């Protein structure tokens, strides 16, 4: 038995929550113990650009992008659990980081 930590990131929290629900369902079907999903702090990146290409430094526009994250710990992963995770079809905008931690 080994512990697996999944970290998921996405710009849209609705797509992220659907993917997390699919992962949790797949893991629970195999009988593995799961902890989470744990919501991670939302990271915000702000960009300020000039509206005018030449003058008017006071005229600026601000853009913001939010990165949402979730973390799932699979405590007692089996080979069936790993197979079911590999067969999942997640949305393309989800970034998944997988770490294996031996007990």
From Swiss-Prot:
List UniProt keywords, sorted A-Z: Ribonucleoprotein, Ribosomal protein
What is any one of the record's Gene Ontology cellular component terms? ribonucleoprotein complex
List the Gene Ontology MF annotations in alphabetical order. Answer: structural constituent of ribosome; tRNA binding
Q: Which residues form a coiled coil?
A: none
Q: Which Pfam families match?
A: Ribosomal_S10
PANTHER family to which the protein is assigned, alphabetical: 30S RIBOSOMAL PROTEIN S10 FAMILY MEMBER
Q: How does it assemble?
A: Part of the 30S ribosomal subunit.
Could you tell me what this protein is called?
Answer: Small ribosomal subunit protein uS10
Q: Please name the taxonomic classification of the source.
A: Bacteria, Pseudomonadati, Campylobacterota, Epsilonproteobacteria, Campylobacterales
